[in-house]
UniProtKB/Swiss-Prot annotation:
This is Methionyl-tRNA formyltransferase. Keywords: Protein biosynthesis, Transferase. HAMAP family: Formyl_trans. The keyword rRNA processing does not apply. PANTHER family: METHIONYL-TRNA FORMYLTRANSFERASE, METHIONYL-TRNA FORMYLTRANSFERASE, MITOCHONDRIAL. CDD domains: FMT_core_Met-tRNA-FMT_N, Met_tRNA_FMT_C. GO terms for molecular function: methionyl-tRNA formyltransferase activity. Belongs to the Fmt family. It comes from Rickettsia rickettsii (strain Iowa). It catalyses: L-methionyl-tRNA(fMet) + (6R)-10-formyltetrahydrofolate = N-formyl-L-methionyl-tRNA(fMet) + (6S)-5,6,7,8-tetrahydrofolate + H(+). NCBIfam families: fmt. One of its GO terms (cellular component) is cytosol. It is an enzyme of class 2 (transferase). Attaches a formyl group to the free amino group of methionyl-tRNA(fMet). The formyl group appears to play a dual role in the initiator identity of N-formylmethionyl-tRNA by promoting its recognition by IF2 and preventing the misappropriation of this tRNA by the elongation apparatus.
C-alpha cells in the first residue's frame, strides 16, 4: 500500500519503520527542525531523521491549513495517510484526500483519555488497564471509529518511558495488521459514555500537594517524568523527585512532615519514600548522594 506518513516524536518511529519495511512510504510530513542545546543548533525530529536515512521525501510545513499543502497532498500518489503524534490539526480536506482516509494510533482505551497526553494521564490517574487503538480520524478530537484495538494490563508501578515504548511498539504492530485487513474490517463507533480528556500537562501540575495520598503523588512522579516533573521547594530551591515509592502506613504527622533522616515524608494518607531527586540546575542524585550535600532535617514540614 502507498502511504503518506505524518508524525514527529520518538513515539512515531516504530510505526514508520514498520511501514518502510512492509509498504511504500511516498512522503513524510513532520515538524520543522528546532534549535536545541547550548549552541542552539537546528535538530531534525526523529521522524525527519528516519525518513532522511531512507531517502523518503520530507515536508515540514508550519501548518496544514492552506491550499498549497492540500494540493501537494492531493498530488502524492497514496492510498492512505497515517498520522501519529504529528503536532498539527489535520483539516477535513486532508482527512478525505485518500481512498482509505487517515489512520491514527492512540495509546489509550478510547473514549477514555482523548487528547494530547493519554500516556501521562493513564499513569497519573492510576489506571490498571489500557489499550492501543487504531482509529480512522474524523474532524473531532480522537472521536473517530476504531478499526483495531488491543487491551493490556498495566504493571502497578509502570513508568512513563515503559508505557511509551510498549504502546509505540504495539501500535506499530497493530497498524500493519490493520492495513493488511483494511478491506474486511468493520469499524466500531466509540461509545458515548466513559469519555475523558487527557489535557496537556502544565508546569503548575508538577508542584506537590502533600495533602494528597502518597500513592497519588507516586503516580504523578511516574507520569510526569521527565516533564514537567514533580517538585517541592526547600530553602527557596526547586527540587524534583525523580523516583519514589509509597507506603500504605498510618501516621499522625502533619502532611509534608519529614519523618526520618532518609527523607520519608508524611502525606495526606500514607508515606512517600524518596529514592532519587534533582535540585534545580544540578544533576540527578540518589537519596544517599543528595543527603550528603543537602541536609533536610527530620520534623521539617515541606511546602
Amino acid at each position: 500500500m502507498k502511504v503518506i506518513f505524518m508524525g514527529t516524536p520518538e513515539f512515531a518511529v516504530p510505526a514508520l519503520k514498520k511501514l518502510i519495511t512492509h509498504h511504500e512510504v511516498k512522503a513524510v510530513f513532520t515538524q520543522q527542525p528546532k534549535a536545541k542545546g547550548r549552541g542552539l543548533n537546528l535538530a531534525k525530529s526523529p521522524i525527519h531523521q528516519l525518513a532522511f536515512e531512507h531517502q523518503i521525501p520530507v515536508y515540514t510545513p508550519s501548518t496544514l491549513r492552506n491550499d498549497e499543502i492540500i494540493n501537494l497532498i492531493n498530488k502524492v500518489n497514496a492510498d492512505i495517510i497515517v498520522v501519529i503524534a504529528y503536532g498539527f490539526i489535520v483539516p477535513k480536506a486532508i482527512l478525505e484526500a485518500k481512498k482509505y482516509g487517515c489512520l491514527n494510533i492512540h495509546p489509550s482505551d478510547l473514549p477514555r483519555h482523548r487528547g494530547a497526553a493519554p500516556l501521562q494521564r493513564t499513569i497519573i490517574e492510576g489506571d490498571r488497564k489500557s489499550s492501543v487503538c487504531i482509529m480512522r480520524m474524523d474532524t473531532g478530537l480522537d472521536t473517530g471509529d476504531i478499526l483495531m484495538k488491543e487491551d493490556f494490563d498495566l504493571e502497578e508501578r509502570i513508568t512513563l518511558e515503559e508505557l511509551h515504548n510498549k504502546c509505540a511498539n504495539l501500535g506499530a504492530e497493530l497498524l500493519i495488521k490493520t492495513l493488511a485487513n483494511i478491506d474486511n474490517i468493520v469499524p466500531i463507533t466509540q461509545p458515548s459514555d466513559g469519555v475523558t480528556y487527557a489535557h496537556k500537562l502544565t508546569k503548575a501540575e508538577g508542584k506537590i500537594n502533600w495533602h494528597e495520598s502518597a500513592y497519588k503523588i507516586d503516580c504523578k512522579i511516574r507520569g510526569m517524568n521527565p516533564w514537567p516533573g514533580v517538585y517541592f521547594s526547600y530553602n527557596d530551591k526547586i527540587i524534583k523527585i525523580l523516583e519514589a515509592e509509597y507506603l500504605n502506613a498510618d501516621h499522625h504527622f502533619t502532611s509534608g512532615t519529614v519523618i526520618s533522616d532518609k527523607l520519608e515524608i508524611a502525606c495526606g494518607s500514607g508515606i512517600l519514600r524518596v529514592k532519587k531527586l534533582q535540585q534545580e540546575s544540578k544533576k540527578a542524585l540518589s537519596i544517599e548522594e543528595f543527603l550528603r550535600g543537602t541536609n533536610i532535617l527530620k520534623d521539617t514540614v515541606l511546602k
